[in-house]
C-alpha cells in the first residue's frame, strides 16, 4: 500500500515458522547461529540452521555472516538453487586499530566495491556490520560510499552495551564536571545467549584495558536460558555479582540464579536482591 522501495523484516524466532516468513523475500540475511530457543528450534546448530534456512527462497540471494555454516543450511540453499554470498567463502573483513576493511575473496565477484578500506568502527558487532555491508553490495540500486560510512558512524542498538545515566540524577545538569565523572558508569546489555555473552565479554575487556575500578554485574536470567553458558565468558571480568529476580512466568528467581552462580563464580562476591531497582 505504501509502495516502499525497501522492506526489512527481522525474524523474531528461527525463520521457517516465524510470522515474517509469509512474505517472499528477494534477499535473506543470516547474521549468526548459536544455541538458543532450543524448545522451539532444536538443541543442535544443525537443527537451528535448518530452521533459520526456512526464510530462503528459490533462486534468490542469501547473505550469510556466520563463519561456521551448518551443513543443513548449505544443503537447503543448494536444494532451492539459492545464490549464496558467504563470509570467508566470498567475502571477509579485518579490524585495524582505528578502522576496518571489507573485501571480496573472489575477483570475479559482481559487487559494487571489491575492497572497502578505512571504514569507521561502529557501536554494533563488527561481524554484523560486515554482513549488512555484504547485503548492501548486492542491492539492485545505488548507495554511495559516503552514505555507508555515515551510517556506520550513526548506527546503534538500544540495550546492547548501552551506557545509561542514573534516572534518579535529575540534578545532573547542576553537578560540576568532577562530580559527574565520579559517577559509576552504567551499562545495560540484554544479551541472553552464549554468543551475545562472548561479545559482551570482548567489550568489557576493551573497557577494562582503558579504565580502572570494579565491575559490578546486576544480572537476571530467564529460566529457559543457558545460564552457565551466558555467565561463563563474563566470570574473569566481573568483580561482584548481584542476582535479581525477573518477572513473568519465565522469570528466574534471584535465589536460583545465586545457586547457579555459586557453581562457577568461586572468586567473586555474590549477593541477591529482589529486583534490579533494589540493587
Describe each model-derived feature in a short phrase.
Residues 56-64:
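Short loop-to-beta-strand entry elements in the cores of soluble alpha/beta enzymes
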Residues 5-9, 19-29, 33-37, 47, ...:
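Nucleotide phosphate-binding/pyrophosphate-handling subdomain across enzymes
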Residues 2-40, 74-114:
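Extended acidic/charged loop-beta regions that coordinate divalent cations
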Residues 45, 72-73:
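Short regulatory helix/loop adjacent to the ATP-binding pocket of P-loop NTPases
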Residues 42-50:
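Nucleotide-sugar donor phosphate/pyrophosphate-binding loop at the beta->alpha transition
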Residues 49-57:
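Membrane-proximal helix-turn-helix segments that form the acceptor-binding/catalytic region
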Residues 33-36, 89-91, 220-222, 245-250:
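Short, acidic/turn-prone active-site loops that include or flank metal/cofactor-
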Residues 63, 67-72, 78-81, 85, ...:
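C-terminal helical cap/extension that packs against the catalytic core
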Amino acid at each position: 500500500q505504501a509502495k516502499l522501495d525497501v522492506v526489512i523484516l527481522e525474524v523474531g524466532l528461527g525463520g521457517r515458522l516465524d510470522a515474517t516468513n509469509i512474505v517472499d523475500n528477494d534477499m535473506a540475511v543470516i547474521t549468526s547461529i548459536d544455541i538458543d530457543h532450543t524448545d522451539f528450534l532444536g538443541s543442535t546448530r544443525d537443527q537451528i540452521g535448518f530452521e533459520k534456512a526456512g526464510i530462503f527462497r528459490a533462486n534468490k540471494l542469501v547473505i550469510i555472516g556466520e563463519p561456521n555454516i551448518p551443513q543443513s543450511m548449505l544443503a537447503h540453499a543448494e536444494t532451492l538453487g539459492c545464490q549464496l554470498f558467504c563470509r570467508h567463502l566470498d567475502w571477509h573483513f579485518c579490524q585495524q586499530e582505528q578502522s576496518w576493511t571489507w573485501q571480496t575473496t573472489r575477483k570475479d565477484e559482481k559487487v559494487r566495491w571489491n575492497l572497502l578500506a578505512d571504514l569507521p568502527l561502529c557501536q554494533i558487532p563488527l561481524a554484523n556490520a560486515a554482513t549488512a555491508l555484504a547485503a548492501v553490495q548486492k542491492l539492485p540500486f545505488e548507495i554511495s560510499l559516503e552514505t555507508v560510512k555515515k551510517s556506520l558512524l550513526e548506527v546503534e542498538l538500544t540495550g546492547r552495551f548501552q551506557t545509561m545515566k542514573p534516572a534518579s540524577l535529575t540534578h545532573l545538569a547542576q553537578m560540576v564536571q568532577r562530580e559527574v565523572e565520579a559517577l559509576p558508569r552504567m551499562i545495560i546489555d540484554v544479551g541472553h545467549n552464549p554468543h551475545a555473552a562472548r561479545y559482551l565479554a570482548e567489550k568489557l575487556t576493551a573497557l577494562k584495558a582503558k579504565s580502572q575500578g570494579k565491575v559490578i554485574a546486576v544480572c537476571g536470567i530467564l529460566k529457559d536460558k543457558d545460564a552457565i553458558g551466558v555467565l561463563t565468558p563474563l566470570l574473569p571480568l566481573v568483580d561482584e555479582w548481584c542476582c535479581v529476580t525477573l518477572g513473568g512466568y519465565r522469570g528466574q528467581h534471584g535465589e536460583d540464579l545465586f545457586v547457579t552462580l555459586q557453581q562457577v563464580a568461586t572468586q567473586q562476591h555474590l549477593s541477591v536482591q529482589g529486583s534490579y531497582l533494589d540493587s
